Amino acid sequence: KEGYLMDHEGCKLSCFIRPSGYCGRECAIKKGSSGYCAWPACYCYGLPNWVKVWERATNRCGKK
């Protein structure tokens, strides 16, 4: 599975002002194989199916 990691509000995990390697570490924490900053958000590869990733159809970012 691949996709954009989400923060606690359902938004894409920002990497806009993060140090180099931030997204790779965040993806590894979620058991992903790799990841990078697809400016301005973290994109991961090889994620297990239990990890929730951002999807346009189910986007809840900024909504209450």
UniProtKB/Swiss-Prot annotation:
Tell me which domain of life the UniProt entry assigns to the organism this sequence originates from.
Eukaryota
Q: Where in the cell is it found?
A: Secreted
Please list the GO terms describing molecular function. Answer: sodium channel inhibitor activity; toxin activity
> Which segments cross the bilayer?
none
Q: In which tissues is it expressed?
A: Expressed by the venom gland.
* Entry's Gene Ontology BP terms: defense response
Q: Which residues carry this modification: Cysteine amide?
A: 61
What is the designated name of this protein? Beta-toxin Tf1
Lineage summary:
Eukaryota, Metazoa, Ecdysozoa, Arthropoda, Chelicerata
